[in-house]
UniProtKB/Swiss-Prot annotation:
SMART domains: Sds3
Keyword set, alphabetical order: Acetylation, Apoptosis, Chromatin regulator, Coiled coil, Isopeptide bond, Nucleus, Phosphoprotein, Repressor, Transcription, Transcription regulation, Ubl conjugation
Any GO CC annotation of this UniProt entry: nuclear body
Protein's gene: SUDS3
Modified residues (N-acetylserine): 2
Subcellular location field: Nucleus
Acidic residues bias (residue ranges): 23-37, 45-54
Nucleus recorded as keyword: yes
Principal location class: nucleus
PANTHER family documented for this protein: BREAST CANCER METASTASIS-SUPPRESSOR 1
Subunit structure: Homodimer. Component of the SIN3 histone deacetylase (HDAC) corepressor complex. Interacts with SIN3A. Interaction with SIN3B enhances the interaction between SIN3B and HDAC1 to form a complex. Interacts with HCFC1. Component of a mSin3A corepressor complex that contains SIN3A, SAP130, SUDS3/SAP45, ARID4B/SAP180, HDAC1 and HDAC2. Interacts with USP17L2; the interaction is direct. Interacts with FOXK2.
Species name: Homo sapiens
Modification Phosphoserine occurs at: 32, 45, 53, 228, 234, 237
Summary of the tissues where the protein is detected: Expressed in various cancer cell ines.
Protein name in UniProt: Sin3 histone deacetylase corepressor complex component SDS3
Amino acid sequence: MSAAGLLAPAPAQAGAPPAPEYYPEEDEELESAEDDERSCRGRESDEDTEDASETDLAKHDEEDYVEMKEQMYQDKLASLKRQLQQLQEGTLQEYQKRMKKLDQQYKERIRNAELFLQLETEQVERNYIKEKKAAVKEFEDKKVELKENLIAELEEKKKMIENEKLTMELTGDSMEVKPIMTRKLRRRPNDPVPIPDKRRKPAPAQLNYLLTDEQIMEDLRTLNKLKSPKRPASPSSPEHLPATPAESPAQRFEARIEDGKLYYDKRWYHKSQAIYLESKDNQKLSCVISSVGANEIWVRKTSDSTKMRIYLGQLQRGLFVIRRRSAA
């Protein structure tokens, strides 16, 4: 069929409804709509393909990420194992660096400790030398002082002994007691056995350690005057005048010790008795008899509680005079 025949309208049949009219514009619109529909279906198909591709790509990326993470873990684990092996072998760089730093600190502390030890040792040695010198100096000073004190003490004792010896030589003749001449008769058969005479021997001259040098020299001068020949004196001279008992050097007192008591100047004195002690220089001391010995007594001053030793010879010669006093 030709195009004209296709385009020409068919003859209308009798009794049939009229055929619709054909317009070319409508065909074009229909074709355009079909094209648009086909284009839309094509786009939808492309979008579905793209979505499927994106899903596959996401799955592939996730697998790659997991694989990469596992690989990183394995690499890090291998690195740590390698570092641990190097640390055990001592070849790890970080370990060597820190060990070097610790070694430097150790050497520095050792050096400081040695310097401190040296400094302290020098200080101790200096103190030792100083203390040793001070001890030696103190020892020498004490030795010299002790020697001087002993020499002075011995010289003093020597001087006192010489003075006492001189005093005994000068007063020896006056202190000697002449023995009583007695005749021993033959005892008759009926006579009783004679009882021996229990007379107490006179006290010998005692060394005096309580007098000063001035008192000793004064006693020596007095004794020398007594031993020198006396010249006749006129009644008006001072020597002819009667001397008082305290001033007369030739006056002697009766003094003895019996049964732990002192008999002096017709009075008895015992231990712990309060007395006055008068010396030749008119010094009067308040004392208490501390003890009574065989040939001497000890008295204690009430002022300073110092003790003095008084011999019987001194009391007999009048160098010291004892007076009673009230105990209150």
